[in-house]
Amino acid sequence: MDKELKALEEFCRRAGCTLTAQERLPNGGLILRVENVDIGPGWNRERATVLFLAPPGYPASKPDCFWIEPGNFRLANGATPQAANDGNPIPGDTVSGRNTTWFSWHVDPWQPGRDTLVKYFQIILSRLKPAR
């Protein structure tokens, strides 16, 4: 996992964002927090903080979904993004009442040993660009 976290940190640095936190959860999962993410045009803000979960059992268990902080993340016209809503918590999160917008976004197929946290973050970026 350390090698993957270093690779994600380097990818973020090159992309102009920052991997700022890795919060270990009691269930064995790990919340990853990436700040200052360029999300492209069409949103109600220019940059975002992205949170995603390396689930218990990762990499055999694939990442699933992601969150934008703070919540109330919307399209520029005020509409709720496709497959998103406010109020769905991060599974196992120890921060009560964390203010996020949840994106139901899934990766298929996932191949442990080949697919990485960098790949999943790239999938998140492809969901955010273009805005929809």
Task: List each language-model region with its residue ranges.
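UBC/E2-like fold recognition across ubiquitin and ubiquitin-like conjugation systems
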Residues: 1-45, 57-132
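Short beta-strand-loop-alpha-helix junction that forms the active-site gateway
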Residues: 54
